[in-house]
């Protein structure tokens, strides 16, 4: 047995051994060294099995970290990145909604401390799916100092900040230019960055934020990046969720930042899907036709309306009034407005059998598991789904961040 010491922290690294050549007394002594108890009554084969299992477990632990971090309170400001385990990377999810981002990051192995959202329905859904809590708060009235006092009572170091300041909320009522992010919820996000100084952040938003301008003609993204670049090395990514195992062509802006003192330059996350042909088609998430309730099918009046609207829009050059899914390809983007008529993504069997997607199918398109609880009226549920970050997309972004930091 050899002992490695690093910064006064010791870990025992077990060398590989041939347990089959040991007698029972040697095996019992080895069990004692490995901390295996209550084994004196075991026979030789049982002892070998116990020892090999312990060694295998130790090897896994050793690969995760070259040292065992003590149970003392650690100041993560001073803890080298390579000494941190995945479980020690703590996350706050701002504008968390019903939890799509948190679900993906949790599955990736990150530790969510808390979520915050202003919509009570979304927070109620969130809290039915996680051990930690989300809190229904207005960020303009919840400065990070207050958050820390109320919801981070153990004063855990926040390593990653995530969230997507709502594009439609790029303003606070009564204040200057509504498109100027300096007047917006975006600045509340910046306040949390400045206060917690996390190692990394992930900011998600619609692709349209890249072309938005203020009343003065300034590019919104330039103003945003001016704030973010102060303390972080940043990269702006335009990513398709369908490249990350999501059955939906949802295109999003993802800004990733790594704190400058870490001397890491983030790169664009690599697609998980190699070609467009390998993207997950919508047919993989559809419920069999015979199981679909009649209420999801369009009425004759609606079918006529779609046909008429299609013709009018063609004449005006606006495209189609309703979008029929190609079931051999990923779905169109599912927006929060889908609850109104469902015309953004329809399943067409023939000219007289066209239907909307069910709640379960909408969840699957956003890569929520079927057992993920989203509560409220149909309208509330669909808005929550449409506003969410696709879980599988968040999962792969989480894995990307973990790889950067470790």
Protein language model features and the residues they cover:
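Basic helix-extension-helix modules of the SAP/HeH family
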Residues: 1-64
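DnaQ-like (DEDDh/DEDDy) 3′-5′ exonuclease domain used for proofreading
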Residues: 42, 59-83
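Short conserved micro-motifs at the rims of enzyme active sites and ligand-binding pockets
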Residues: 47, 267, 344-348
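Short, amphipathic alpha-helical "lid/cap" segments that border enzyme active or binding sites
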Residues: 48, 186, 190, 225, ...
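Core alpha/beta nucleotide-donor-binding catalytic domains of modification enzymes
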Residues: 72-197, 207-211, 215-219
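Class I S-adenosyl-L-methionine
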Residues: 145-157, 168-327
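C-terminal target-recognition/interaction regions appended to catalytic cores
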Residues: 296-406
